[in-house]
Swiss-Prot record:
It is an enzyme of class 4 (lyase). Secalonic acids show unprecedented anticancer activities against various human cancer cells and might be interesting for further derivatization, targeting diseases such as cancer. Residues 28-123 form the EthD domain. It holds the Pfam family EthD. Pathway: Secondary metabolite biosynthesis. Belongs to the tpcK family. This is Decarboxylase AacuI. GO terms for molecular function: lyase activity; oxidoreductase activity. It catalyses: atrochrysone carboxylate + H(+) = atrochrysone + CO2. It comes from Aspergillus aculeatus (strain ATCC 16872 / CBS 172.66 / WB 5094). InterPro entries: Dimeric_a/b-barrel, EthD_dom. Keywords: Lyase. Decarboxylase; part of the gene cluster that mediates the biosynthesis of the tetrahydroxanthone dimer secalonic acid D. The pathway begins with the synthesis of atrochrysone thioester by the polyketide synthase AacuL. The atrochrysone carboxyl ACP thioesterase AacuM then breaks the thioester bond and releases the atrochrysone carboxylic acid from AacuL. Atrochrysone carboxylic acid is decarboxylated by the decarboxylase AacuI, and oxidized by the anthrone oxygenase AacuG to yield emodin. Emodin is then reduced to emodin hydroquinone by a yet unidentified oxidoreductase. Its EC number is 4.1.1.-.
């Protein structure tokens, strides 16, 4: 049984987009360097045109390395004391969930990308979530 897509936020804005966030872990035994290299130099080039074909508005990767996580020591306070241990956040901004569903049904995706994910990702531990994007600041300006 498929759940209905929740409505857009109640402010009646048509500018809201969905953001699919994959909270990723690298494959066990893979170095941080090799994980990032595979995602940015192998997987991304194979995926980017397909994302454009199916209407993805933006796709970003945030790699959380040992070095970048060490910066958290400067930010920890009583309210923000729990540090996420994910290796990467991959975010896709979509106008419509159906676009992403069509992308995953594309024969090229199934043939090339499903297997590629197993080469770098711990797909059993990785998680995902989706939510509405509300932009507050863009390019240093309040929107």
């Amino acid at each position: 049984m498929s759940l209905p897509i929740p409505p857009r936020p109640a402010d009646n804005s048509t500018s809201h987009s969905l953001c699919l966030t994959i909270c990723g872990y690298r494959r066990p035994g893979m170095s941080e360097f090799d994980y990032r290299q595979h995602m940015t130099q192998v997987s991304a080039p194979m995926t980017a045109d397909l994302m454009v074909k199916y209407g993805v508005k933006r796709w970003t990767m945030i790699h959380n390395t040992t070095e970048s996580r060490a910066l958290m020591d400067q930010l920890i306070d009583p309210q923000m004391a729990n540090i996420a241990d994910f290796d990467c956040f991959s975010q896709m901004v979509l106008h419509d969930l159906a676009d992403y569903k069509r992308l995953k049904e594309d024969p090229w995706y199934r043939e090339h990308l499903v297997g590629d994910h197993e080469k770098f990702a711990d797909t059993r531990r990785s998680m995902m979530t989706i939510g509405w994007v509300t932009e507050i600041v863009r390019d240093g300006q309040v929107v």
